[in-house]
Design a protein with these regions (language model features):
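Long, hydrophobic N-terminal alpha-helical segment
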Residues: 1-35
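Short, conserved charged micro-motifs
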Residues: 16-19, 57-63, 102, 126-131
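Short glycine-/aliphatic-rich beta-strand segments at the starts of folded cytosolic domains
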Residues: 3-10, 49, 87-93, 116-118
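Short amphipathic alpha-helices in soluble, non-transmembrane regions
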Residues: 21-23, 62-70, 132-135
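Short, charge-patterned binding micro-sites
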Residues: 34-58
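Glycine-rich, aromatic-bearing surface loops/beta-hairpins
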Residues: 93-142
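Mid-chain, well-packed structural core segment of small domains
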Residues: 66-100
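Beta-strand elements of well-folded, non-transmembrane domains
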Residues: 9-13, 28, 55-57, 97-101, ...
Length: 142
């Protein structure tokens, strides 16, 4: 159901990079992280951690873990699918950095988070088709 998952995480100067990598690995245990340095508006150093997961086994494990979240979180996700899915069938999720570091999954709507771009295997690759597949998967567990 998932073709690939792209992820991105910003580490600011006042954050612990290793701790945030641990949080990312809580959500994506097999992540092979690429590290890039950038400069913020105030000339502060920002580390960008990113990468892509495209192995079927790994994307299936992610989906299984996602669908194991508590009912309230899954119901909120189901109600937000229209605004979290683009016209090409990509699902955009953000996970709380703090919760991820505490080995919990919490979908959030704030910018300072772990960003996931999840390409849904929808044929044709359209928003409506992807949302239908996502609703079907969510309805199996709700």
């Amino acid at each position: 159901m998932i073709h690939n998952i792209r992820y991105r995480l910003f580490v600011y100067e006042d954050e612990n990079e290793e701790e945030l990598i641990g949080g990312l690995k809580n959500i994506l245990p097999t992540a092979k992280i690429e590290r890039e340095l950038a400069e913020g508006m105030m000339e502060d150093e920002i580390i960008i951690l990113s990468g892509k997961i495209d192995k079927k086994k790994e994307t299936k494990e992610f989906l299984s873990s996602l669908l194991s979240m508590d009912k309230l979180s899954l119901e909120k996700l189901a109600s937000d699918l229209q605004k979290k899915t683009d016209k090409s069938g990509n699902l955009f999720l953000r996970f709380s950095k703090t919760s991820a570091c505490e080995e919990k999954w919490e979908i959030c709507d704030v910018g300072d988070s772990i960003h996931l771009k999840i390409k849904i295997m929808a044929y044709p690759a359209k928003k409506e088709v992807a949302i239908k597949l996502l609703y079907e998967a969510l309805n199996e567990v709700l």
